[in-house]
């Protein structure tokens, strides 16, 4: 299943015909050619507003030109705004990739606390847009895969693999609903993914709920880690309990 997590580009010159605008649009086009959606924003405004998109984005690219900086990093509005943006993003999301796009000398204006939070610095015109796009997409995909907890990731793979599901004889993976008009409506309303993912407590690809192995066992251990517990066990209400 292809989830919608665009790469967000924040650049005041995104639609301009200057050097910066042409460069960032070439990068955006290269990313779109690789199959990733781009959300281009042309106004910085309050960067903290864009930070709220951290749950919907697969990566952020912020374009900053060298001439935008003023003397003194402690009071520079660009540095202060960038720091506030990063702090707001990292407050809720420690892993989403953040890139700065700028000139070669732009990075010297940025203090270490900002540089530490970046996944990379993209030097304008130093590499081809196609290469930079592939690098950013690799990091974005790695981030999205890391977001998925063990069982959900295994369930996604199972549902996408075209595996026949006979675990629920009441609907047989949704097939039974396709035999009547109202069933078709039900199928279209809830979607095939929900019905194909309706499985029993013991699927080889997912693990055994009673034996705590496979993706189920891995998820139980992950849940125990999150809740700082010694053990965590999943149960379901039915014959398996």
What are these regions (language model features)?
Residues 192-241:
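Conserved N-terminal alpha-helix of the aminotransferase class I/II PLP-enzyme fold
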Residues 13-15, 66, 100-107, 127-128:
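Short beta-alpha junction loops
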Residues 72, 102-121:
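Alpha4 helix (beta4-alpha4-beta5 surface) of REC/receiver domains from two-component response regulators
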Residues 3-31, 39-40, 60:
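Conserved acidic segment of CheY-like receiver
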Residues 28-53:
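A short, well-structured beta->alpha microelement
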